[in-house]
Every structure is written in structure tokens, then in C-alpha cells.
A protein has these predicted regions:
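N-terminal acidic leader/helix
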Residues: 1-27
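C-terminal end-of-chain micro-motif
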Residues: 1, 68-69
Length: 69
């Protein structure tokens, strides 16, 4: 799944515009990166990010790839 697909899924789940959905996604990624930098990132943090955005847990793969980049 790519960034545009993630934004579209968030937009649908949150009933918001594309810009707002992108902001939500970036905020979650920032939070996950902070946890990663402190060596405190756990798998359930990725699931929580999905849940917070109204996404299915299969979107964890996107976050893993984004954090690895």
C-alpha cells in the first residue's frame, strides 16, 4: 500500500478531506518515529496507529516500510 492509498483510506474512515487525512497520517508517523528513536517502539504501537486512523491492521505493513525508509 502506498501513501496515497493510505490517505484515501483515512479520508474515508474519518470523513475528512485529503489534506486533513495526510496531516493525520504524518502525525502518526511522527509519533511512531519518536518511539523508534527511543527504542520503545512495539508492534502494538503500529496497531494502535492503524486503529487511531480508522484503518485495518493490515496497514501495519505501510508503517513498517515508512519507518524503515
Amino acid at each position: 500500500m502506498n501513501r496515497n492509498q493510505m490517505i484515501e483510506n483515512i479520508r474515508i474512515a474519518c470523513h475528512c478531506g485529503e489534506r486533513r487525512a495526510g496531516e493525520y497520517l504524518e502525525a502518526e508517523l511522527r509519533s511512531l518515529r519518536e518511539l523508534q528513536l527511543r527504542n520503545e517502539l512495539r508492534y502494538d504501537d503500529l496497531e494502535t496507529a492503524c486503529s487511531s486512523l480508522g484503518l485495518e491492521y493490515d496497514c501495519v505493513e505501510y508503517f513498517l516500510a515508512a519507518l524503515a525508509a
